[in-house]
């Protein structure tokens, strides 16, 4: 009897260590400079992996030995749109075995940056703890397989390591997402871990497993949102264990528009639909998000900021929704005509009163741009009644 293996199930999101496996293998062979203990790539190659090669095809040395299927020349994809100096500081922090804390407003790609850094440094982004109000100390340290615990008592085999403890034993990078959502007493479990680089297991006292020591290469990347509700203040002791880096919104309109286009196109194509949103619509969408986020238009006109964070990630979501509407309901309406309704839904998330601020934006910059002759903004101005709903 022949057993047929079923193909691997399709996944909505492929982890970066698999998606960029060719790039990682190429960069490991491309740069043979010094690298910190247990690092897969050199610090310089880590930065190149995150920021890309600016469209330039990198060439492997003639004597470089690479796995089959890895090309000798390769353009490294740009993955993070931001300040290169920020990424370099993050890499230096990790190389110095200091904890790294990425802070910023929601939707500024902190989690993506932490994924990319951990992937480039240790080859995996999967050793992660998601911080919530229900996160317990066990999820940062260890738990127990209670069936084995009852049968054998406290043994190393019965211990269930957390992602952090697994990273310590492997010399890898662990990630703690939204660390400030954890309760303070849970956060403080990281203090001794980051300073002493070990975890005590008192249940195994008297054995060699009573202390779990971090292998060379272990480090921790945490993220925290600055404008979120339901967060807990970090203790001064824990703050001192991290180097802080602030990840801000994308500064350039064209760069943000290109990112929104690329990310929205990818999400729509995963759904099996074509991406059919004009550049003019995307530019208007991103411009509106930037104006409302910054409290000032590109022309310098004052804008009342909503309490909702108008993040790039939210702009990608709206662009994807517009593209899906165009694909699944073709000819029903102009895609631009759907934009006001989506913006209204975004600003109402945190405070219904923000709808009035959006109408104020329409009565200000949108109207003035329409009066200056812009056809796109004229159409949007004519749709102001949508915001009265």
Predicted regions and their residues:
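Charged, glycine/proline-rich intrinsically disordered loops and linkers
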Residues: 46-72, 282-299, 365-373
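C-terminal engagement/docking regions of AAA+ P-loop ATPases
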Residues: 327-389
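AAA+ P-loop NTPase catalytic core and its hallmark functional loops
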Residues: 4-271
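Exposed alpha-helical structural elements
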Residues: 163, 255-259, 280, 284, ...
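Conserved AAA+ ATPase small/helical "lid" subdomain
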Residues: 84, 257, 263-337
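Surface-exposed polar/charged interaction patches
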Residues: 29-33, 266, 295, 368, ...
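Short alpha-helical scaffolding segments that buttress acidic/His motifs in well-ordered protein cores
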Residues: 90, 285, 342-343
